[in-house]
């Protein structure tokens, strides 16, 4: 049990993020296949269990092995996955609101997730900015996770805004627009850095190959958050320009989806693709992009857009099942809990 606690990395919460977004997209596409609504509820309850098991291990690791946790925060690659605990809370907040219609618990998860994400969005970049050991080898799409977490804040936060008044409403509006603004422009800056690495450096190591899908995270989350903010902000009287930007941004995401598929096939054929926890990077980014696809369809009414989303949904479901099975096998063998940070 001690090895499980000692080597429990924050990146495990990516499983909660992925399962949560699969639950939401299952609910969305239950319009086509009603049984998906039941699957959505099953995934929701399974995800709650996952989260609290992981949260217990995460807290125990802070108590028993604080040096390991601090080392993770300072690591040029692993540090980017530290915010996943906060993003997982934000995703559960979304699930409670959309799947269970439970605004109260949705608010609680959103508040803790937003606070955690605010802290991580400062801590992780701070350590990176002052580090003198970061190299081009360390650059990878996992660096998008802190910006993605900020962008996820207004997804649930915008759904909460109409239910608040006075200073609490104003504070929530401020938090939502801060999250989207800070996250989106940090993503644009990091996009240039990551593309630079892709073009002028050697390919990602096979264990990090699935992170190419993380590019879809800020795109999908950015679209969903922007649409939610616009729809729930009475002071925005002309909404069409934001909708059009969302559609354009969605097109960029479609290109990334195709590129991610091509790159994954390349890694499978040329470099192999051994299982690693990074496989969970397949899930959340693709899932949130699928959610954005459904929202774009709802706004513009282009059925072909929703058909694309429904097709990608089954790819998402396939990724989730394979990754879950592989993860369970590796947990059983103990391979995922070997010492990595000393």
Swiss-Prot record:
Example of a GO MF term: sulfite transmembrane transporter activity
A Pfam family that the UniProt record links to this protein: SLAC1
Gene Ontology CC: plasma membrane
Intrachain S-S bonds: none
Identification of the protein by name: Uncharacterized transporter MJ0762
UniProt membrane topology term: Multi-pass membrane protein
Taxonomy, superkingdom: Archaea
Record-annotated membrane-spanning stretches: 8-28, 39-59, 79-99, 108-128, 142-162, 175-195, 207-227, 242-262, 276-296, 304-324
Organism: Methanocaldococcus jannaschii (strain ATCC 43067 / DSM 2661 / JAL-1 / JCM 10045 / NBRC 100440)
Keyword terms, alphabetized: Cell membrane, Membrane, Transmembrane, Transmembrane helix, Transport
Database matches in Gene3D superfamilies: Voltage-dependent anion channel
Localisation: Cell membrane
GO biological process: sulfite transmembrane transport
Similarity annotation: Belongs to the tellurite-resistance/dicarboxylate transporter (TDT) family.
């Amino acid at each position: 049990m001690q090895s499980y606690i000692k080597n429990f990395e924050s990146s495990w919460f990516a499983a909660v993020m992925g399962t949560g977004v699969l639950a939401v997209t299952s609910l969305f596409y239950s319009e086509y296949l009603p049984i998906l609504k039941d699957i959505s509820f099953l995934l929701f309850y399974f995800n709650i269990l996952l989260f609290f098991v992981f949260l217990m291990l995460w807290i125990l690791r802070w108590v028993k092995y604080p040096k390991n946790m601090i080392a993770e925060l300072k690591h040029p690659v692993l540090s980017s996955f530290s915010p996943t605990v906060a993003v997982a809370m934000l995703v559960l907040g979304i699930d409670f609101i959309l799947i269970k219609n439970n605004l109260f618990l949705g608010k609680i998860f959103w508040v803790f997730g937003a606070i955690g994400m605010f802290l991580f969005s400062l801590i992780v970049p701070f350590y990176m900015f002052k580090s003198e050991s970061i190299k081009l080898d360390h650059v990878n799409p996992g660096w998008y996770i802190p910006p993605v977490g900020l962008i996820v804040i207004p997804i649930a936060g915008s759904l909460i805004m109409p239910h608040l008044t006075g200073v609490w409403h104003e504070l929530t509006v401020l938090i939502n627009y801060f999250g989207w603004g800070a996250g989106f422009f940090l993503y644009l800056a990091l996009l240039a850095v990551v593309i630079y690495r892709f073009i002028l450096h050697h390919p990602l190591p096979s264990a990090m190959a699935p992170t190419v899908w993380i590019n879809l995270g800020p795109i999908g989350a950015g679209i969903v958050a922007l649409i939610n903010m616009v729809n729930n902000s009475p002071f925005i009287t002309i909404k069409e320009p934001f909708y059009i930007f969302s559609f354009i941004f969605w097109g960029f995401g479609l290109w990334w989806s195709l590129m991610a598929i091509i790159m994954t096939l390349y890694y499978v054929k040329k470099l192999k693709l051994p299982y690693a926890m990074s496989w969970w990077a397949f899930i959340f980014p693709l899932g949130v992009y699928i959610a954005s696809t459904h929202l774009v369809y709802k706004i513009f009414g282009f059925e072909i857009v929703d058909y694309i989303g429904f097709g990608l949904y089954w790819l998402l479901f396939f990724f989730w099942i394979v990754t879950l099975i592989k993860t369970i096998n590796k947990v059983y063998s103990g391979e995922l809990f070997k010492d990595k940070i000393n």
